[in-house]
Amino acid sequence: MKILITGFDPFGGEAINPALEAIKKLPATIHGAEIKCIEVPTVFQKSADVLQQHIESFQPDAVLCIGQAGGRTGLTPERVAINQDDARIPDNEGNQPIDTPIRADGKAAYFSTLPIKAMVAAIHQAGLPASVSNTAGTFVCNHLMYQALYLVDKYCPNAKAGFMHIPFMMEQVVDKPNTAAMNLDDITRGIEAAIFAIVDFKDRSDLKRVGGATH
C-alpha cells in the first residue's frame, strides 16, 4: 500500500506549521505501507497543482492531507469538504477568494473516503485526544481536501483521500494565553496512529460509532 501525506508551509504570521514539522518526522514505512511526504504551499490552487503532480506520479492508494487548526484540542479527521473558497485572511501569495467555487465541474461537497472513525479510535488508543470534525473551514485546508477528493476521483478512482487537522505546537502558544497546544512528538504519534487505521481499514468499512455533534 502507498500513502501520500501532505503538510502545509507556515501561514497567518506563524513561523512554523506543525503539519509540516510532524510529517518530516514520519518514517518511510508505517504498518507495511510506503509513506511519501510532501510539502504544499498554503496557496489556493497552487497547493492542488503540487498535489496533482504527486498523485499522478506516485499513484497512491490513499492520500492524507494534514493541516494546522490553531485552537483545537486534539487531532480531528475531517468528515467533509465543500466546493467553496471564502478566505477570512489572504493565503501566502495574497489571494483572498470570497464565495468562489473550487471546481466549476465538481460536486457541492465530497465526503472523506478515509476511515475517519477508525482513525479517531486509533488515536485514542495511542492515548491522545481526537474527534471527528464536521467542518474543514473555507480556507486552504478545505480547498486542498476538496481538491484531493476531486483529483483522486479523476486520476486514482480506487484510492481513498481525506484530511486531518492538528493543534498548535507548544512553542506557538507561548504568547497565546489559554490556547490549546500539543507537543510535536505527540502530534506525530497521532498521525502515525491514524495511518495505522488507514492501512487496517483499507479493504473494509469504517467503524460504526458515535462521532457526530449537536452543533
Swiss-Prot record:
Gene Ontology BP annotations: proteolysis
Pfam families per record: Peptidase_C15 (PF01470)
Primary subcellular site in the record, as a coarse category: cytoplasm
EC number: 3.4.19.3
GO CC aspect terms: cytosol
Keyword set includes Kinase: no
GO molecular function, one term: pyroglutamyl-peptidase activity
Gene3D superfamilies referenced in this protein's UniProt entry, alphabetically: Peptidase C15, pyroglutamyl peptidase I-like
InterPro entries (alphabetical): Peptidase_C15, Peptidase_C15-like, Peptidase_C15-like_sf, PGP-I_bact-type, PGPEP1_Cys_AS, PGPEP1_Glu_AS
Active site: E78, C141, H165
CDD domains the UniProt entry points to: Peptidase_C15
Annotated catalysed reactions: Release of an N-terminal pyroglutamyl group from a polypeptide, the second amino acid generally not being Pro
UniProt-listed PROSITE patterns: PYRASE_CYS, PYRASE_GLU
Localization per Swiss-Prot or TrEMBL: Cytoplasm
Class of enzymatic activity (EC top level): hydrolase
Key words, A-Z: Cytoplasm, Hydrolase, Protease, Thiol protease
UniProt record similarity statement: Belongs to the peptidase C15 family.
Role noted for this protein: Removes 5-oxoproline from various penultimate amino acid residues except L-proline.
Subunit-level organization: Homotetramer.
The name this protein goes by in its record: Pyrrolidone-carboxylate peptidase
Organism: Streptococcus pyogenes serotype M4 (strain MGAS10750)
